[in-house]
Amino acid sequence: MTTQNELLNRIAELETKVAFQDNVIEELNQVLIHHQFVLDKLQTQVRHFANKFKNIQSSNVASQAEETPPPHY
């Protein structure tokens, strides 16, 4: 009987561990979903700022015809 009780205790312990691990996996999944959402948002912002930077750069650069010659000419 001791062996059977030991086995039942081990099974109960394993069931407890599995339940705990299921809970941890679910929590980690929620954190991962949140991080993916934040990452997507940051990537969108980086693309937006990169485009904005390109537009600012191209609008501030004058063509060679528009440039005034240096003072030594």
Curated annotation (Swiss-Prot):
It comes from the Bacteria. Belongs to the SlyX family. NCBIfam families: PRK02119.1. This is Protein SlyX homolog. It comes from Haemophilus ducreyi (strain 35000HP / ATCC 700724). The gene is slyX.
